[in-house]
Amino acid sequence: TIFNPQIYYDGAGGLYDSNFIRHLHVEFEDDNYHSILGESFFTEPSLRIPATVTFDGITLDSVGVRYKGNSTFCLPHEQGNVKVPYNLDMNRWISGQQLMGYNKLKLANAWLDPTYCKEYLASKIYRNYLPTPEVNLVGLHTQGNYTGLYVNTESINKQFLNKHLGENNGVLFKCDGAGVFCSQGGGQGTDGGFPSLEYLGADTATYYDSYTIKSDHGWEALVDLISTLKFNPEDLHEILNIDRVLWAMA
């Protein structure tokens, strides 16, 4: 079967419609939200606080919100800039709640991309060859104040796996060690190693500082991939879709 990922992407009027910029409003129950989320980023990264979210005439209550990112959080945060990236979980407290068919929103502040175009253009190119997160731009308002323009990127999670692969039991890792840009360190559960796919030994614990696991399991699979890459590259095709990886790198 010829791979045709286009059938999975939003059309006009969908959450990731890129024909125009819509605005998303987030109203936190606690006006002290920025201090709470800024502190918890380092001490309790999974902590979410409730907010009401309004987008394109749709209002959702009890949405779980936390800050996200590593470098794109640390750099503005340490400068006292409130334009940090957000992660919104629609069904954190209300089971099955979604926004236009999606249960998670990831709002990137494009801190390292003044053009706001890199992720959008990459998504448009990659989607022709492999499963790719959808991307568009939204204006974010928090507590009634305009926070700025954000890159709205589809979350690579179980819903994404179901959408493109028809199953959701795969292994997911975020290859970005926090602490590299954070003077405080420790954000998002890591201490700032580099995810270089370098073999560090058979003990999975030696990889904790460099990779953040996003699935229910997978450390052994990660070490197996890295070990095969170093010691048995001729067997790599058995555990890695080399063709799609090359398309992504190209």
Regions found by a protein language model. Give the residues of each.
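Phosphate/dinucleotide-binding and metal-coordinating scaffold of catalytic cores
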Residues: T1-A250
